Amino acid sequence: MIDFKKLKIIYNKIELNDIQNHFKTIDKSIVIKQLENCSFCWKEVEIYFNDCHRVLEVKTRNITVNFYFQNKKDIPPRAKILLTLKQILTVIDYFKIQTNFLFHVILYNGTRTLPQKNEVLSPEHINGGFTSLHQSQIFILRHEEFSKTMIHEVLHHCSALHNENYTTNQINSLKQNFTLKDCRLRYNLYHLLST
């Protein structure tokens, strides 16, 4: 059970003054060259990402966020970025998550859509982001709801909430019932069911 009073106390104690001076634009080649063989991405995201040449880097405590953009107008308002970081820090502090996170936020404008009749469910229908529990990198693939997706991906790193020990029978049942293309989409299904 979540203690909302404790959550509010943590939230109110977090100061964002240190973040204000840690916004800087850098060259993309310094950060990451490309999304190679990404099974969670789709063609349009890769095209958008490859056309991004600049990155807005924002740092605080144990979080670095890189916003990949084509035009400065694509960058979310500073107030929204600060609020998102405060919310993420609240979750990290509340659940005592010890990870140093590196976010790659690709500001692709495509929206989620449901598959057409007889179309197989795929990442472009579900994914807003992804992470690996064994790494500290989190990828956010859509401008749409980026802040909610960032928080959602951090929650995957909370051992009290996330369990990746699906049995083979559970995975096969989910794949059959939801017409999933392959087993890599089990995390996508988790996203679909939890949002």
Give the residues covered by each predicted segment:
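Short catalytic/ligand-binding loop motif for oxyanion handling, primarily in non-cytosolic enzymes
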Residues: T113-P115, C158-S159, Y166-T168
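Structural signal for hydrophobic/aromatic residues that build the beta-strand cores
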Residues: F103-V105, H152, H156, L174-L180
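Intrinsically disordered, low-structural-confidence terminal and linker regions
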Residues: M1-K24
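Post-HExxH zinc-binding segment in Zn-dependent metallohydrolases
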Residues: H162-N163, T167-T195
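Acidic, Ser/Thr-rich intrinsically disordered and amphipathic helical segments
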Residues: L83, Q87, T149-E153, L193
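Short, charged/polar micro-motifs that form catalytic or ligand-binding hotspots
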Residues: N71-R78, I140-T149, K181-L192
